[in-house]
Amino acid sequence: FLYKKKEMKIWDGNHLDLTFEKKENNIKFIGKKGNNVICKYYTKKIRKNFQSQVKSINYNKHFWEIKLNTEKIVKARSVIFTCPYPQLKKIARKYLDKKFLKLKITMEPNITTMVAFKNQKNIPVSSIKFNDEVLTWAANENSKKRFKSSNSLWTLQSSVKWAKKSINFYKKNKNVENMLISKFLNFTGFKKNKIIFKKTHGWKYS
């Protein structure tokens, strides 16, 4: 649907799978302008308040009252929480059905590093899936053709097993970031002295 609407496009190019796992559908779709096009498309006709902290949410018989840190009160017929299940249970427990609270939902951590290499030649590879205990996947952001850059931009994704061991201290311990990058350098041959930017994000529940 969103492909026909030209909100999404096919991510073409070579997607290397070094795990040699058989895939039935190799077509990969990505947002034409970014990763959040699905959210933007389905909320484009809805009023929004960005960078507003929610202080309280209360149900008033017929509607919800959402109080923001600006003291503004937003009234709504429905409230949708988009947060991990463990956090949802804490912040909305009194509004949730008991059956929902008893669900056994497994959330897994993820650590991702964005890294840029100066003046690297564009290589004909869009993504690489690794058979490794630390680094499992890397995406060539240049191959998505959302922008033009003389630098080589990559997103590196950790394995779930390794993320479980590292998620609680990745911000303070630079060895976590360095390990992901080191693995990528070893696999691809990119040079460490060409790195001009690196940034790591972690999600305890993903």
Question: What does each of the following model-derived ranges do?
Answer:
Residues I73-I128, F190:
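Central helical "cap/lid" subdomain
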Residues F50-E65:
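A conserved short coil-to-beta-strand element within the FAD-binding core of flavoproteins
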Residues F1-N14:
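N-terminal FAD cofactor-binding segment of flavoenzymes
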Residues K148-L153, S158-K204:
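Flavin-binding catalytic cores
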Residues L16-Y41, N168-M179:
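Short beta-strand to alpha-helix junction loop
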